[in-house]
Amino acid sequence: MKTIISLTSIPPRFRTLPAIVYDLEKHQDVDEIWVNIPYKYNRFPDTEVVVPDFSPCSKVVVNRCTDYGPGTMYMGPAHSEKCDADLMIAVNDDTKYPPQLSSRLVELYRDEPAAWCLSGFRIEEYINNNGGVRRYNNEYVDVTESYGGVILNMNWLRRMKDSFLDFYKLTYNDDIIISNLLSKMNISKKYVNNKHVHVNTAEQI
């Protein structure tokens, strides 16, 4: 199955973005790394978008697209006719991910096709514990978070792309939108503790 990593960014972070992408290419076993950069940013309407130089990276696909806020990492490839991937691993642009994260997530997906994540929570527990959540393993969650990395079937994203736009008008919280639409499609969302996939915790930089 063709697997891509997908992320997006904003102009203030472009200076560090090439190093993040290079680190992903060096340590993650995927076919392509999609860097989704909007033509224009809703948050930065007067900023001229100058795409960073990714020439040292052989797997990078720079996808110029519409701005869907943080959800651009999901919707950029979903709306692109050039994207022929089977699986996507969504990650953040300000996080250093542990080696082998992608291969571990693919293994989990092959064993059980679900939206597997290394960061997520159950809404009731999150509310009752004032944002504190316990670390699950191989258990369901209500919300997957791209911070820790989440693997999704591209067909799921293609099916939800029109509905995503309706929700996007109400909130920029891409994790909530994606998780809600996965639930509507009866797709399981499962959390795996990083200790059980033998990878280190993602490190925000």
For the regions a language model picked out, list residue spans one by one.
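Short beta-strand-to-loop acidic/aromatic patch adjacent to the donor-nucleotide binding site
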Residues: D84-K96
